[in-house]
């Protein structure tokens, strides 16, 4: 099957048969200074390792477990920070939207707008995102089977947008738990669209800490290596210099100081797997 190539700025290409792209950053913008510092570290490490890179952060976490949880600085301030990061480091950027009115202004600043998993079946939001003409990253809902992603793809296509990336972030497995279906990611690859793996959110234990999500940070490397062995278009991760005190999803975040060691392993797995000849076992 032909593999679709998504072309971003800086000659970054996202495709299942290309070297993997890192979609990395922080969960939510906590401050301008912290965002700049984290972005700088990612840029230094990815340039050293020769890994194509897209910066990620959220300006609003609209689906927190508790009404009292930190959500972020909001769209206006968030876009100002994104513009500064983009102009300073000259990297493509991705962030998520939650409401129709956010789509157009966000698409003017970032390269990729992300459809959150919980909202992936909201047709009006899908259409508004599609009409921006931006590249779209679709988070697979925890409650959908991999083959059902074709319906979401069709919605974007019918609205005039074919620049789609699919992202696996785990599937619900009973209460307060997620599992990753490796064969499901391969099934999504059969669409021809690039598939990336959100290896940090897949470590979540939703609602695992009563009023916020828990996580399994200690298994971050094992899960990511397993996903990369499928030969994916990209890896999606979030890191923090002090995960235990991060304002959102700290239990899933990779400690920032481990980024280089972590990515060195992921690149090695990606290069090895993509050096293999494809074996068609269906015949």
UniProtKB/Swiss-Prot annotation:
GO terms for cellular component: cytoplasm. Its EC number is 2.5.1.55. The keyword Transferase applies. It is an enzyme of class 2 (transferase). It is found in: Cytoplasm. The keyword Ubl conjugation does not apply. Keywords: Cytoplasm, Lipopolysaccharide biosynthesis, Transferase. Pfam families: DAHP_synth_1 (PF00793). It catalyses: D-arabinose 5-phosphate + phosphoenolpyruvate + H2O = 3-deoxy-alpha-D-manno-2-octulosonate-8-phosphate + phosphate. Pathway: Carbohydrate biosynthesis; 3-deoxy-D-manno-octulosonate biosynthesis; 3-deoxy-D-manno-octulosonate from D-ribulose 5-phosphate: step 2/3; Bacterial outer membrane biogenesis; lipopolysaccharide biosynthesis. One of its GO terms (biological process) is keto-3-deoxy-D-manno-octulosonic acid biosynthetic process. GO terms for molecular function: 3-deoxy-8-phosphooctulonate synthase activity. Belongs to the KdsA family. NCBIfam families: KDO8P_synth, PRK05198.1, PRK12457.1. This is 2-dehydro-3-deoxyphosphooctonate aldolase.
